Amino acid sequence: MRKILYALIACVAFCAQSCQESLEDKAEREAKEYTKSFCPTPTVNYTRTDSVVFYKSTKSYTYYCSFSDAFDNEEIVNKNKQAIHEGIHKMLTDNPGLKSYKEAGFKFVYIVHSTKEPTKILYQYSFSFTK
């Protein structure tokens, strides 16, 4: 009987603790887990995700990426900036996993660096979905 009671108490304590994670804490944890598990990602369409960070102070989910090869060129990026912007916006809009973050007013920031010159920013934009 005592074992069942202790197991029940442990289960209730665990459930209560997991329910207390704020949306900001969840975003921070998920960003860290994604970065640890997947970054840097393989390069696809000349783009690699280097890391993902959630900044609680600004409620910003920030993606740090790099352009490589043909896209690692400021002139080409500038010519295609609108298409890049629209593609990222569509990806964020169509992602159901981000719904609660968008509803909470989180911003999604993309900062894309050059692979050849890592300190050079080729693209940067902050997307907001508040109504």
Where in this protein do the model-derived segments appear?
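Short, intrinsically disordered low-complexity segments
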Residues: 1-2, 88
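Sec-dependent signal peptide recognition
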Residues: 2-9
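C-terminal motif of bacterial Sec signal peptides marking the signal peptidase cleavage site
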Residues: 15-18
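Bacterial signal peptide processing site
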Residues: 20-22
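Polar/charged, Gly/Pro-rich intrinsically disordered segments
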Residues: 24, 28, 32-33, 37, ...
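Short, non-transmembrane amphipathic alpha-helical segments
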Residues: 73-99
